[in-house]
Design a protein with these regions (language model features):
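C-terminal helical cap(s) of enzyme catalytic domains, especially alpha/beta-barrels
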Residues: 243-257
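Alpha-helix-loop-beta-strand connector modules within alpha/beta enzyme cores
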Residues: 27-45, 102-116, 139-146, 214-226
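Conserved, mostly hydrophobic/aromatic
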Residues: 2, 46, 64, 75, ...
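Non-cysteine beta-strand/loop elements that form the S-adenosyl-L-methionine
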Residues: 8-13, 43-45, 151-156, 185-197
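Active-site acidic/histidine proton-transfer and metal-coordination neighborhood
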Residues: 53-152
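N-terminal pre-domain/capping segments
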Residues: 1-47, 51-73, 257
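Active-site beta-loop-alpha junctions enriched in small/polar residues
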Residues: 15-17, 48-50, 88-90, 122-128, ...
Length: 257
């Protein structure tokens, strides 16, 4: 599928994304062998949707920790470049408590993460209770974790839903300047390049095909021309597939040309 669409970077789930079952080691070993033989490019693994590293529910939090631990072990087997996990949501709990839980889980997961895989935290879409959606909140989380091995993932739809003006070149410039001022630019490891179905600041995480949503081609053109993005891995998580996905990737490449 990656070859059919012209993809050079791939992100996958290595277990059922809607279950706590976690990855099977023998399956990871088989996939890893096939992936290395394919020699397509960087590989990233996304945490299952159920994982919430800031959950105030002790049982849910314990399950999230265990699933992260098993997932990063499997990432080492398949030699994935990064394991992506959302910053988490504390619901109605105090923000400081949710931040502490998220940081503690990230620290514990880092201790289990193999050298060939980097733990990456993805900012959320400004939803209620989210630990980190803004760059300032990301800085607070990175300070709490206090580990240089932790990397950052930015999702363009999430940022737009949070309120960043990514539909305007000057808004894109301002966001990346904030990233630099907060000393987060050198922690950026991956971009999830998704357009947004809803308007800026909606706090709604619904992805749209690049160029067909609220951010638009002008916004994405400004994003891909940022120096931090030019040599960065980019993953598309939109509703496109097959030939439509191939054309979408070509559009993104043309914006960067």
């Amino acid at each position: 599928l990656a070859r059919e669409t012209g993809a050079e970077v791939v992100q996958v789930f290595i277990s059922n994304p809607r279950a706590w079952s976690g990855p099977r080691l023998e399956t990871a070993q088989a996939f890893g062998a096939e992936w290395r033989e394919a020699a397509i490019g960087p590989l990233f693994v996304h945490a299952p949707y159920l994982v919430n590293i800031a959950s105030p529910n002790p049982e849910f939090l314990s399950k999230s920790i265990e699933l992260c631990r098993r997932s990063v072990a499997a990432c080492g087997v398949i030699e994935a470049g990064g394991f992506v996990v959302h910053s988490g949501s504390g619901g109605e709990a105090e923000v400081a408590d949710a931040l502490d839980r998220s940081a503690t889980v990230l620290q514990a997961t880092l201790a289990e993460t193999p050298d060939e895989t980097q733990l990456l935290v993805e900012l959320m879409a400004g939803t209620s209770g989210a630990v980190a959606s803004t760059l300032g909140e990301a800085r607070a989380l990175f300070d709490a974790v206090d580990d240089e091995r932790l990397g950052l993932v930015l999702d363009t739809c999430h940022l737009f839903a949070t309120g960043y003006a990514l539909d305007e070149p000057k808004g894109v410039d301002a966001m990346f300047e904030e990233l630099r001022q907060l000393d987060l630019a050198d922690r950026l490891r991956l971009i999830h390049m998704n357009d947004a179905k809803f308007e800026r600041g909606s706090k709604r995480d619904r992805h749209e095909i690049v160029g067909e949503g609220g951010i638009g081609l002008e916004g994405f053109g400004a994003i891909v021309r940022q120096p931090e993005v030019r040599d960065l891995s980019v993953v598309v998580e939109t509703p496109s597939s097959g030939e439509r996905r191939r054309l979408e990737l070509e559009t993104i490449r043309s914006l960067a040309a």
